A protein has these predicted regions:
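S/T-rich, low-complexity, solvent-exposed segments of bacterial secretion/appendage proteins
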Residues: 1-385
Length: 385
């Protein structure tokens, strides 16, 4: 009878633990990193008819072997790779969208200003002495310069924003590396099959998921489940053997980002950190292109205006000053100083200015630049789909 009671008690105890495990699974179904657990049970071998051997073994009930986590290593690895690629694409796209907004006519009015400049020049060909039209011409010049300054300021803020975001993400990445090493220490001490071990393994996987979404990492595991983590591709050690090697980020003067570990360059090609680097490269390219375009526009329009004569017969003055998009400024001119005339007549220079309008004029080049930016955003959006 006592044997039957013992067998029954072991069964009740085992299934009570099993129900508790099921409850944990239900409660943590949406918890990041949590893996479904299963209680492993085995037959408990009872006593035999001899203290030296068990020729006639009696049943002994149920023994609890431990907790098993239901995980698929291949699926987890594939999920982390997919997550890294998705985060890179999404992060890059978010900054390219912001660049498109900064360059849009709704934000800076450059395209509207250029169109207005040529439209007013056309109107001045019919009425070159009209002071209202002359004032409108100068206002369009000021609008163009203001638009370039606005766009430059927006891009500067984006560069600062990306740099700040990268610094914050690197800090979080390094904090997670430190936390992962603490998990390693705990796993080496944990009893195999225990709830504590399962919880540590869950937290380990959660941290690896986070790290993989930020940068490419390659984990390997020892018999205790402790992880050695290396950077994907380069193989640089990040965590392992009681060592944690934090990464760092540096911004160049133009805003481009570079990463390093242990003082050596670290190439990151996936994850949100890669997306930030690609976004920073795009912003830097756009800032340089905006400066070049502003300078070229100013030189081209200045040369065209200086080729004419104003209402008093004086040579035309430059319309713009400044050497970059951020410093481009409309020159202080009066309506009488608009150089509408040239040697061919009182409206000759406005006719010449209008004739510039074509495939390579400032208006067309700006439209082409916006189209290229839109194509870059479209490509990034397709990658993010």
């Amino acid at each position: 009878m006592s044997d039957l009671l013992g067998i029954g008690y072991s069964g009740l105890k085992a299934y009570s633990r099993a129900l508790s495990t099921i409850g944990d699974n239900i409660a943590n179904a949406q918890t990041p990193g949590y893996a479904r657990r299963r209680l492993e049970m085995m037959e408990a071998v009872g006593g035999g008819n001899s203290i030296f051997y068990r020729g006639n073994t009696n049943p002994g009930g149920v023994d609890i072997r431990g907790i098993d986590r239901s995980v698929d290593g291949w699926l987890i690895e594939d999920s982390r790779i997919t997550s890294g690629d998705a985060e890179r694409s999404a992060t890059k796209l978010s900054w390219l969208d912001k660049v498109e907004g900064a360059l849009s006519d709704e934000t800076n009015g450059i395209k509207t200003g250029l169109t207005k400049l040529y439209t007013t020049a056309d109107q001045l060909t019919a009425d070159p002495s009209n002071r209202t039209l002359r004032a409108q011409f100068l206002q369009s010049v000021d609008d163009i310069a203001s638009g370039f300054r606005t766009a430059a300021g927006q891009l500067d803020k984006m560069g600062e924003g990306i740099e700040g975001a990268a610094a914050s993400e690197v800090d979080q990445f390094n904090a997670d590396l430190g936390a992962l090493e603490q998990i390693n220490i705990g796993l080496r001490k944990a009893r195999p099959g225990s709830t504590n071990e399962a919880s540590l393994l869950d937290e380990r996987d959660r941290l690896l998921d986070k790290l993989s979404s930020q940068a490419g990492v390659s984990p390997t595991f020892d018999n205790n489940g402790a992880v050695t983590l290396r950077a994907a591709g380069s193989g640089d050690l990040l965590v392992g053997g009681g060592v944690v090697n934090p990464i760092s980020v540096t911004a160049a003067p133009d805003g481009r980002l570079s990463y390093s570990v242990g003082g050596s360059p670290l190439a990151i090609s996936t994850g949100s950190l890669a997306g930030l680097a690609e976004g920073a490269n795009h912003v830097a390219d756009q800032r340089a292109a905006l400066d070049t375009m502003a300078t070229d526009f100013a030189n081209q329009l200045n040369a065209a205006h200086q080729a004419g004569a104003d209402a008093n017969g004086n040579p035309g003055q430059p319309l713009f000053t400044g050497t970059s998009a951020a410093t481009l400024t409309a020159a202080t001119l009066t309506p009488d100083q608009v150089a509408a005339a040239n040697a061919s007549g009182s409206n000759g220079n406005m006719l010449a200015l209008g004739a510039m309008r074509g495939a390579n004029d400032p208006e067309a080049r700006w439209s082409g630049h916006l189209a290229t930016q839109a194509q870059a955003v479209s490509s990034a959006r397709a990658q993010d789909a």
